[in-house]
């Protein structure tokens, strides 16, 4: 007999009955609030074309490296799952067969946030009431794939059903933003913004850096092989992104290093970089200098700056060579912020025109570095628990370790940071439940009155992300 799939009404709320009752009341005030998704990686083409999603595998498995990295860790070849190769080709695998492999291994996700999110999607979005396993694989595949061909499951209809008020995608400076233009011109009222992510033309160690610079020059008409022209090209593209609705930039660097070189020093370093002769230390210094230059541009154009540092990207060389980037082989690293951010903060940390939202994969930095920095510098805010830490436990640790020094109001609420479109309501629901549980504990301990906790819960779910990202 199939096992029922049940979402308990009190999931993630405290076990203690009195505290749980408080958490229920807090959650009830936030559960139906509109979703603010100020940072993520959904594909704007979905909303531009409003074409049906192909099938269960292409929508829920292939884009989700949270899921297939776990399967890979247990010996499942990515070809069995239909994951594209670096050159765009794929192994000849039937999507149904790939789904069967996934379903047969779904138990590997027990206790993980991926299981929480996916079970929410299955239950709430697709109205499935039995658990996914080998026996239910075909039922799931047929049910989901059939639903995806109906108007109610088109991207725009789901956007509206999910009560998304605004969502931001993330694009390279080389992107023409044609999909965002199509959305704006279509008459659809859904709000889909972009964000400026210049890593491809900032990181000398990126495998496509040289070709990206050539495209950067062709797109902007600037002499990007000279430091002043390179900076002008960034300003031009940032203005283009802002005109298309962007309110933020995003920077994914190996570290949080910043620098403040003189123009002459920066030009000499840049000359070395564009000749392809930069050492690892020089590449790091170049990224550091560009971050400070991006901050200077944010002071001028008002774009909110996000920094996502501290990840060793593509740790598995064989996997990277075969499948390319973003295939589940990224590993958190220890990250310094106190020394790394000082050159940038010396220039802009007190400037009311500047806003920097910093994330971390190094939880040891929360209470030692990031919360004290955000609790002091007016320009600095803390991004929520990110990536490897957006599990309920990670969200709880984030609150515990940052509250004393940064409070709630030097944080920015929640952002889902996902490619998995259908999981967005689930991710926000988890965050709202965890915050309700955390606040309920403070009320039960008489550290907050319930009316204060209610206001904070609404701020974290809705007001703070709108405010932080200028939405």
Swiss-Prot record:
Please give the superkingdom of this protein's source: Bacteria
NCBIfam families, from UniProt?
PRK02925.1 (NF002794)
GO terms of molecular function: glucuronate isomerase activity
Q: Which reaction does it catalyse?
A: D-glucuronate = D-fructuronate; aldehydo-D-galacturonate = keto-D-tagaturonate
The record's top EC class is isomerase
Gene Ontology BP terms: D-galacturonate catabolic process; D-glucuronate catabolic process
EC number, as in UniProt: 5.3.1.12
Q: Looking at the keywords, is Nucleus present?
A: no
TM segment ranges? none
Keywords of this protein's UniProt record, alphabetized?
Answer: Isomerase
Q: Could you identify this protein by its name?
A: Uronate isomerase
Keyword presence, Iron:
no
Could you tell me which SUPFAM superfamilies the record lists for this protein? Metallo-dependent hydrolases
- Report which gene this protein is encoded by: uxaC
HAMAP family documented for this protein = UxaC (MF_00675)
Task: Spell out the InterPro entries in the cross-references.
Answer: Metal_Hydrolase, Uronate_isomerase
Which family is this protein grouped under? Belongs to the metallo-dependent hydrolases superfamily. Uronate isomerase family.
The pathway to which it is assigned is: Carbohydrate metabolism; pentose and glucuronate interconversion
